Regions:
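Generic hydrophobic, amphipathic alpha-helix propensity
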Residues: 18-29, 46, 71-75, 79, ...
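Hydrophobic/aromatic residues within well-ordered alpha-helical segments
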Residues: 21, 64, 71, 75, ...
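Helix-turn-helix
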Residues: 32-66, 70
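Short, hydrophobic secondary-structure boundary micro-motifs
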Residues: 42, 116-119, 182-183
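Hydrophobic alpha-helical connector segments
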Residues: 70, 84-110
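Amphipathic alpha-helical segments used for helix-helix packing
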Residues: 107-127, 144, 172, 176
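Amphipathic alpha-helical packing segments from all-alpha helical-bundle domains
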Residues: 126-150, 154-169, 185-188, 192
Length: 206
């Protein structure tokens, strides 16, 4: 009982407090790594933003690079979860395409810091070298599963890989301002790509 009391403070257990500190650090990391113009991410800056001492940083992360990778993986997990939930809650291929693109826009564009972490940070942050390549298969698989009209497995795989690359470039352009189309037009264009990708080669021809 005494041990339990020592490990509990203000009604919160030690592990819960540790998890809360880790979440606060990750949230600070998203804001810093996803800042417009790419703010410098240092241990000191992260701790200052999270209002925690460096002792608590090293409680959860071995070093700065491990932290940066954890931030990226956290945003990647959020993106996967949002896409899976959107697709699962929709019926027709058209509905699934709209739901998937809308969910990604909501997560990555409405909260641009997350979008910059997932799509832009790997291009500039050495600690993320290869991280985008590691995450890509999960998104390829998700797209792959939606391309049901393509019966040939090789065709489905190649189409899914190409489509993820195209959509990634579109979202990067939308985030950095290269693409200035209205949101509705942007979503409609991405949905059209998804729908066109699901058609067998030459399937629309007579």
């Amino acid at each position: 009982l005494l041990d339990a009391q020592r490990r509990t403070w203000a009604g919160t257990g030690l592990e819960e407090r540790r998890a809360a500190r880790r979440e606060a650090l990750l949230a600070a990391g998203i804001e810093l790594l996803g800042a417009e113009g790419g703010a410098a991410v240092s241990v000191r800056a992260v701790c200052r933003s999270a209002a925690l001492t460096e002792r608590y940083f090293y409680e959860s992360f071995a070093d700065r690079d491990e932290f940066v990778r954890a931030v990226y993986e956290d945003v990647g997990r959020q993106a996967r979860d949002a896409l899976v939930a959107a697709v699962a809650s929709s019926g027709s291929p058209q509905d699934r395409a709209v739901a998937a693109v809308s969910a990604f826009v909501e997560l990555m564009v409405d909260d641009p810091a997350r979008g910059r972490v997932l799509l832009l940070a790997p291009l500039a942050e050495p600690a993320l070298g290869g991280q985008g390549l590691e995450l890509a298969p999960a998104f390829v698989l998700l797209v792959h599963q939606q391309l049901s009209p393509l019966s040939d497995p090789d065709e489905r795989q190649m189409t899914a890989v190409g489509l993820v690359g195209a959509l990634t470039s579109l979202f990067i352009g939308y985030l950095d301002g290269t693409i200035t189309a209205p949101r509705e037009q942007f979503v409609a264009h991405c949905v059209a790509l998804l729908q066109a990708a699901g058609q067998p080669p030459g399937g629309s021809r007579g």
